[in-house]
């Protein structure tokens, strides 16, 4: 089971936040995450793994402040120790930075690049945020592997279409270039013929 929440920015952009029911489900979330996903976890404490799905083309720096705080409050609320504390640090990083090796326990992860891990602090629990998120909560049983394949297939099709469009434009540019070269060549030929014609006319005048 995966829990889904909806968060909105001040400019009305909506984002999906999701988390697994337990550490075993977290394994699938780690395995089938998307490049657009940002992972959240309470720093140095046990907590849920919360993911934020960005819009295509967005980066971690583009996360709206209010959406970032929604994610941080949600992950803090789902930490047995963290939910009782103030000034809790929450780490977050792109899904692609998560490292999972065979010797790690279930639900445990590391990072490929520590420099890509950011921290946000939740000073204290804000019920208004949690209540708002709770109203959007949905429980689903998604086929994560199929969803990931569908996303990757769509990306491949988009790239294929972009390549085809690029080739079409290149072909069109080459055609225009050939036409311009032919036009310049024809213009040069006409100039030469005109010069020859004028030269012939001058010769005739001299003989007269």
Swiss-Prot record:
Residues of the region (DNA-binding) are 21-25
**Location(s) in or outside the cell:** Cell membrane; Endomembrane system
**Which keywords describe this protein according to UniProt?**
Acetylation, Cell membrane, Coiled coil, DNA-binding, Membrane, Phosphoprotein, Transmembrane, Transmembrane helix
Where in the sequence is N6-acetyllysine found? 23
Membrane side Extracellular: which residues?
Answer: 1-105
Q: Which residues lie on this side of the membrane: Cytoplasmic?
A: 123-208
Q: Which domain of life is it from?
A: Eukaryota
User: How does the entry describe its membrane topology?
Assistant: Single-pass membrane protein
Give yes or no: UniProt keyword Isomerase.
no
Regions crossing the membrane: 106-122
Positions the record marks as coiled coil are 117-187
Instruction: Name any Gene Ontology BP term.
Output: positive regulation of cell motility
List residues modified as Phosphoserine.
204
Q: What does this protein do?
A: Transmembrane receptor that senses neutrophil extracellular traps (NETs) and triggers the ILK-PARVB pathway to enhance cell motility. NETs are mainly composed of DNA fibers and are released by neutrophils to bind pathogens during inflammation. Formation of NETs is also associated with cancer metastasis, NET-DNA acting as a chemotactic factor to attract cancer cells.
This protein is called: Coiled-coil domain-containing protein 25
The record lists the lineage as: Eukaryota, Metazoa, Chordata, Craniata, Vertebrata
């Amino acid at each position: 089971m995966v829990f889904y929440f909806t968060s909105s920015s001040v400019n009305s952009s909506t984002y999906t936040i999701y988390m697994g029911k337990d550490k075993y489900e977290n394994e699938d979330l780690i395995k089938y995450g998307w490049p657009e996903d940002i992972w959240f976890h309470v720093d140095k404490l046990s907590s849920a793994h919360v993911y934020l799905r960005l819009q295509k083309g967005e980066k971690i720096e583009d996360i709206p402040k209010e959406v970032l705080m929604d994610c941080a409050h949600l992950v803090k609320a789902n930490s047995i120790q963290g939910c009782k504390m103030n000034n809790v640090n929450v780490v977050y990083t792109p899904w692609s930075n998560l490292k999972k090796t065979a010797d790690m326990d279930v639900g445990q992860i590391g990072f490929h690049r520590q420099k890509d891990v950011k921290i946000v602090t939740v000073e204290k629990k804000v019920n208004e945020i949690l209540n708002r998120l709770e109203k959007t909560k949905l429980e689903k049983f998604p086929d994560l592997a199929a969803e990931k394949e569908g996303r990757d297939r769509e990306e491949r099709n988009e790239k294929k279409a972009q390549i085809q469009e690029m080739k079409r434009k290149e072909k069109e540019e080459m055609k225009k270039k050939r036409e311009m070269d032919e036009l310049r060549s024809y213009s040069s030929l006409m100039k030469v013929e005109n010069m020859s014609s004028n030269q012939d006319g001058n010769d005739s005048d001299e003989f007269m």
